[in-house]
């Protein structure tokens, strides 16, 4: 092991450490960071060399953060990235600095977004927050209005997690939805992601995603938002149901096939006569 460490350059060590951090399961960033810190044994190298990994993890995971002075959380996503460590809270129309290692928001300041699309963004946000409140007890959503390639675009992100370290499992739901505001009809594109880690007496992870496409009738802001939420609700319900049914099927078939139906002797043990068996006698005499 020592020989291997001597062969690795600092750059290679940081690259390996960064991969561990980026792939940390939901709710386990600190544990992975602390383990990597011990392995690398160079705090300055880790902080400077793996800073991009801290940021990438939070962006990928839709990390929720609370801004002091504001009631609701906002998600850290690529769509709200203003550069130089600053992010956008489109609901409260403020920018803020975000510490990717401490996961803290500071220095909130007024920020004027794209006013031309604000009425659409607000309508979708209102409908989306009602939907998230109903379906995700711990859910957070952030809705952006941006001009992308000359097209006014609405982007809605949802995050919901359950961290149960005492029960040896953590899980996170993420979904991202987009559509452009075009006359008559438009295309809705979504991606749904589930990641769960169970680690009591083992190490099992569920990592799943599904891409969605559907058409949306565009009318006024409020009605379009309602129709958009119908698409979101139907797709997310179908996905969650399919995941549950698939696991039930695996439990009834695949996992049963992995279990031996009979001992190697092909005969069942008569537990009422266990003492007559050699092992029973040995246990009795012990």
Curated annotation (Swiss-Prot):
This is F-actin-capping protein subunit alpha-2. F-actin-capping proteins bind in a Ca(2+)-independent manner to the fast growing ends of actin filaments (barbed end) thereby blocking the exchange of subunits at these ends. Unlike other capping proteins (such as gelsolin and severin), these proteins do not sever actin filaments. The modification N-acetylalanine is found at residue 2. The keyword NADP does not apply. Belongs to the F-actin-capping protein alpha subunit family. One of its GO terms (molecular function) is actin filament binding. Keywords: Acetylation, Actin capping, Actin-binding, Phosphoprotein. Component of the F-actin capping complex, composed of a heterodimer of an alpha and a beta subunit. Component of the WASH complex, composed of F-actin-capping protein subunit alpha (CAPZA1, CAPZA2 or CAPZA3), F-actin-capping protein subunit beta (CAPZB), WASHC1, WASHC2, WASHC3, WASHC4 and WASHC5. Interacts with RCSD1/CAPZIP. Directly interacts with CRACD; this interaction decreases binding to actin. The modification Phosphoserine is found at residue 9. Pfam families: F-actin_cap_A. The keyword RNA-binding does not apply. GO terms for cellular component: brush border; cortical cytoskeleton; F-actin capping protein complex; membrane. One of its GO terms (biological process) is actin cytoskeleton organization. It comes from the Eukaryota.
């Amino acid at each position: 092991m020592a020989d291997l460490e001597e062969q690795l350059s600092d750059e290679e060590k940081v690259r390996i450490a960064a991969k561990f951090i980026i792939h940390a399961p939901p709710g386990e960033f600190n544990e992975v960071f602390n383990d990597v810190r011990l392995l690398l044994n160079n705090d300055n190298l880790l902080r400077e060399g793996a800073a991009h990994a801290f940021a990438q993890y939070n962006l990928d995971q839709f990390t929720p953060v609370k801004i002091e002075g504001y009631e609701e959380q906002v998600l850290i996503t690529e769509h709200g990235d203003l550069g130089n460590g600053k992010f956008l809270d489109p609901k409260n129309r403020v920018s803020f600095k975000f510490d990717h290692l401490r996961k803290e928001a500071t220095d909130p300041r007024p920020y004027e977004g794209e006013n031309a699309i604000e009425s659409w963004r607000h309508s979708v946000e209102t409908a989306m927050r009602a939907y998230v409140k109903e379906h995700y007890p711990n859910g957070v959503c952030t809705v952006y209005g941006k001009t992308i390639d000359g097209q006014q675009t609405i982007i809605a992100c949802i995050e919901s997690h359950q961290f149960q370290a005492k029960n040896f499992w953590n899980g996170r739901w993420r979904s991202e939805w987009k559509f452009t505001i075009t006359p008559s009809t438009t295309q809705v594109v979504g991606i749904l992601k589930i990641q769960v880690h169970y680690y009591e007496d083992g190490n099992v992870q569920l990592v799943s995603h599904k891409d969605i496409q559907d058409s949306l009738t565009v009318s006024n802001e409020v009605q379009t938002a309602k129709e958009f939420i119908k698409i979101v609700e139907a797709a997310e319900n179908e996905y969650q149901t399919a995941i549950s049914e698939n696991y039930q099927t695996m439990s009834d078939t695949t996992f049963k096939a992995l279990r031996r139906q009979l001992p190697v002797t092909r005969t069942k043990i008569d537990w009422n006569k266990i003492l007559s068996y050699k092992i029973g006698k040995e246990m009795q005499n012990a």
